[in-house]
Regions:
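N-proximal low-complexity "stem/linker" segments adjacent to membrane-targeting elements
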Residues: 1-24
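Short, charged/polar "capping" segments at the starts of alpha-helices
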Residues: 14-16, 44-51, 132-134
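Short, acidic, metal-binding catalytic loop of nucleotide-sugar glycosyltransferases
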Residues: 19-36
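A short acidic, amphipathic alpha-helical/loop segment
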Residues: 28, 50-51, 109-114
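Short internal beta-strands
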Residues: 37-42
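Active-site-proximal specificity loops/subdomain of glycosyltransferases
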Residues: 43-95
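Conserved catalytic core of nucleotide-sugar-dependent glycosyltransferases
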Residues: 77, 104-166
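Short beta-strand-to-loop acidic/aromatic patch adjacent to the donor-nucleotide binding site
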Residues: 94-107
């Protein structure tokens, strides 16, 4: 089984804190015992491609110039999802489509836990186990705002229907 991981990175070299947490995120992905390819849709963020190449992460990299976004927008989750679904459908080799932010630590048992779900198709909403605000760990157990990790286990056919809906 393989996973296509939809994520976008902030620019590198502008914030040591952001760089640190994005490095931790990638290292947590690399430590997983699972075949993962990043679906990266970037919007002119600096040094992202260099970072990914240096980290030797399998990836499908697409850059959309900020000039093609609506006025005042920095990114588009819709365009990111469009690109990821196209890659998922075209490759026909992925079992999971994962969305996350790039500032979380991914638990090393993620896919072993997901593999225990015996459904052919499902969506898992996973809350982070560590909440960090401005570089400070706030709490490991308190409920947090936002869903930072979403996992779809879907067939190519379901992905086609999903793409039609968005």
């Amino acid at each position: 089984m393989k996973a296509l991981w939809l994520v976008s990175f902030w620019p590198f070299g502008k914030s040591k804190i952001n760089d640190f947490y994005q490095n931790l995120f990638v290292d947590s992905i690399k430590s997983l015992d699972f075949d993962i390819t990043f679906s990266l849709t970037q919007f002119d963020e600096e040094k992202v491609k260099d970072f990914i190449d240096k980290k030797k992460i399998n990836n499908n990299y697409v850059n959309i110039p900020k000039t093609e976004l609506p006025s005042g927008k920095k990114y588009s989750n819709k365009l990111m999802l469009d690109n990821a679904l196209k890659q998922f459908i075209d490759s026909n080799e992925f079992s999971y489509l994962v969305y996350s932010t790039a500032d979380i630590l991914v638990p090393n048992n993620l896919f072993s836990t997901l593999s225990k779900i015996k459904l052919d198709n499902f969506c898992a909403l996973i809350y982070p186990n560590t909440h960090v605000t401005n570089g400070v760990i706030k709490n490991n157990y308190w409920p947090h705002f936002g869903i930072d990790l979403i996992v779809f286990k879907i067939s190519r056919e379901k992905a086609l229907k999903f793409k039609e809906m968005i």
